[in-house]
């Protein structure tokens, strides 16, 4: 089991410095692949549509996911509800490359997340803070992402979550060793992972940005804040020119420290997706899970 987990972490490392795009059909998946995406997330409704339409959001139709798998050569991810291990069993059976236990879908279990160590396929999970990140890693997550606030086109929550995780890691590095067990208790996180972060100053898995990223500048901002890569959900295919915006966000993620490249990548993209103010949301997806 330990060897499998190490392999999954290494598989996730291969996505580092890349962009993962939400797609709802094979045509969008091909656009994402041609734009330079390192993987796609297959789902029936992007987060902005889930937010707009409401109701219970579940994992996508396996047939649709298989069509996307067959359409592209890059890895395909798909989402399951928090705690819904049977949805995860189904996705593993149809051959997805990664499973996202996602707060964007309606949680199936308000007490427990999936024990990801029961699966061979690697999992990605969202986190708002270091405690959440380490709990998910303790359950077997091979990759972490900020929760942000998906479907809003508003990057503020992703920034908040990344800054929180980074500041808590810096604080942990300054914590005396004899106090680490108390920190583990307070965070509800495995002690060995607390020790790892205190020593290394980073998570033991890669950490991507997700939730509200809509522009090349948003992607570069999150990379400069220390993220290992970018998830873009509604931001591409809810914009005026998806093909051009997809390529621009990939370029911005690669050249995130070069303002001249960022300026050029941001030109003539057409309108970005309509953004939402966080304080006016009826449902905050990031509050789901623990």
Curated annotation (Swiss-Prot):
For this chain, the annotated S-S bridges are none
Catalysis performed (reactions): aldehydo-D-ribose 5-phosphate + D-glyceraldehyde 3-phosphate + L-glutamine = pyridoxal 5'-phosphate + L-glutamate + phosphate + 3 H2O + H(+)
Q: Which residues bind D-ribose 5-phosphate?
A: 22, 151, 212, 233-234
Q: Name one Pfam family in it.
A: SOR_SNZ
Molecular functions (GO terms): pyridoxal 5'-phosphate synthase (glutamine hydrolysing) activity
Please name the InterPro entries in this protein's record: Aldolase_TIM (IPR013785), PdxS/SNZ (IPR001852), PdxS/SNZ_N (IPR033755), RibuloseP-bd_barrel (IPR011060)
Q: Tell me the residue numbers annotated for binding D-glyceraldehyde 3-phosphate.
A: 163
Enzyme Commission number, as recorded? 4.3.3.6
The active site is formed by: 79
Cross-referenced PROSITE patterns, in alphabetical order?
PDXS_SNZ_1, PDXS_SNZ_2
GO terms of biological process kind: amino acid metabolic process; pyridoxal phosphate biosynthetic process; pyridoxine biosynthetic process
Indicate the segments annotated as coiled coil, or none if absent: none
Q: Hey, which family's this protein in?
A: Belongs to the PdxS/SNZ family.
What interactions and quaternary structure are annotated?
Answer: In the presence of PdxT, forms a dodecamer of heterodimers.
| Name this protein carries in UniProt | Pyridoxal 5'-phosphate synthase subunit PdxS
């Amino acid at each position: 089991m330990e060897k499998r987990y190490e392999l999954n972490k290494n598989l996730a490392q291969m996505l580092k410095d890349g962009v993962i795009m939400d797609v709802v059909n094979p045509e969008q998946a091909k656009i994402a692949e041609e734009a330079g995406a390192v993987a796609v997330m297959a789902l029936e409704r992007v987060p902005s549509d889930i937010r707009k339409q409401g109701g219970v959001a579940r994992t996508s139709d396996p047939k649709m996911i298989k069509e996307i798998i067959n359409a592209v050569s890059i890895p395909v991810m798909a989402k399951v509800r928090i705690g819904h291990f049977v949805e995860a069993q189904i996705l593993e059976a149809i051959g997805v490359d990664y499973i996202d236990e996602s707060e964007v879908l309606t949680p199936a279990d308000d007490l427990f997340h999936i024990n990801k160590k029961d699966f061979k396929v690697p999992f990605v999970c969202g986190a708002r803070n270091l405690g959440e990140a380490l709990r998910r890693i303790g359950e077997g997550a091979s990759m972490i992402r900020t929760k942000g606030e998906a479907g809003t086109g508003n990057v503020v929550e992703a920034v908040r979550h990344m800054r929180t995780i980074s500041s808590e890691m810096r604080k942990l590095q300054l914590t005396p060793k004899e106090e680490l067990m108390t920190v583990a208790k307070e965070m509800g996180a495995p002690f060995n992972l607390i020790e790892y972060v205190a020593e290394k100053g980073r998570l033991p898995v890669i950490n991507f940005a997700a939730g509200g990223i809509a522009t090349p500048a948003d992607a570069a901002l999150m990379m400069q804040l220390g993220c290992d890569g970018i998830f873009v959900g509604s931001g591409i295919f809810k914009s005026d020119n998806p093909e051009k915006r997809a390529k621009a966000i990939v370029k911005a993620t690669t050249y995130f420290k070069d303002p001249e490249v960022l300026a050029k990548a941001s030109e003539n993209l057409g309108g970005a997706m309509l953004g939402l103010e966080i304080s006016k949301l009826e449902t905050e997806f990031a509050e789901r899970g623990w």
